[in-house]
Amino acid sequence: MGKKSKRYRAALEKQPKEMLPLGKAVEVLKTYDATKFDQTVEVHMRLGVDPNQADQIIRGSLVLPHGIGKTQRVIVFAKGDAAKAAEEAGADEVGQEDLAKKIKDGWTDFDVCIAAPDMMGLVGPLGRVLGPRGLMPSPRAGTVTPDVGKVVSEYKAGKVEFRNDKGGNVHAMVGKMSFEANKLEENIASFVDFISAMKPQSIKGTYIKGVAICATMTPSVRVAT
């Protein structure tokens, strides 16, 4: 493991040992020394799910109240009216076979990939490139949809996708350090509430085991739930 920076070590000394109410946790996070760039703020949730059980996979997307402070690059597989709607909504690239070939050749310079249902025959074989990068369109995530224009608009407005990892944890970006504290708090609360409402019926024990927030180059702050 690489040596932590002086700034990080200084922030670590301020790191609270106890869990804090969300508002206070955001306050503490924003006291960590600023860097020369606007750090991304993330929320990390430890869930009591078994990722090997199909009914306990936590996956989806939502539009945060104040966006994420980042313009996402969105590409779309669509044709006809759907392609036109995607272009009008601000998609960075819209295509069919030409776009598929570009990706097959290794191009992945985008954040979100959306596909109309009639394009999945073309998109399916791209799974070996898109899957490992978390970019494969999925009905469950809302990125396989007949209403591509609407979904493009949502991602451009700050929609975030999430899926639990192999350890049962869910992560998401929820804004930037430059956001006002109340806006960060509302974004985080919105995400946590959304995940809370997705509790699978098959889970009998504790569902949310821990919540923490951090920025790109800061220690985490644990949040009381």
From Swiss-Prot:
Record-linked Gene3D superfamilies: 3.30.190.20, 3.40.50.790
Pfam families documented for this protein: Ribosomal_L1
Superkingdom in the source lineage: Bacteria
GO aspect biological process, one term: translation
Keyword check for tRNA processing: no
InterPro entries given in the database record: Ribosom_uL1_bac-type, Ribosomal_uL1, Ribosomal_uL1-like, Ribosomal_uL1/biogenesis, Ribosomal_uL1_3-a/b-sand, Ribosomal_uL1_CS
Keywords in alphabetical order: Repressor, Ribonucleoprotein, Ribosomal protein, RNA-binding, rRNA-binding, Translation regulation, tRNA-binding
GO terms assigned for molecular function: rRNA binding; structural constituent of ribosome; tRNA binding
One cellular component term from this protein's GO annotations in UniProt: large ribosomal subunit
Listed HAMAP family: Ribosomal_uL1_B
Family: Belongs to the universal ribosomal protein uL1 family.
Assembly, per entry: Part of the 50S ribosomal subunit.
Function: Binds directly to 23S rRNA. The L1 stalk is quite mobile in the ribosome, and is involved in E site tRNA release.
UniProt name for this protein: Large ribosomal subunit protein uL1
Organism of this sequence: Rhodopirellula baltica (strain DSM 10527 / NCIMB 13988 / SH1)
Gene: rplA
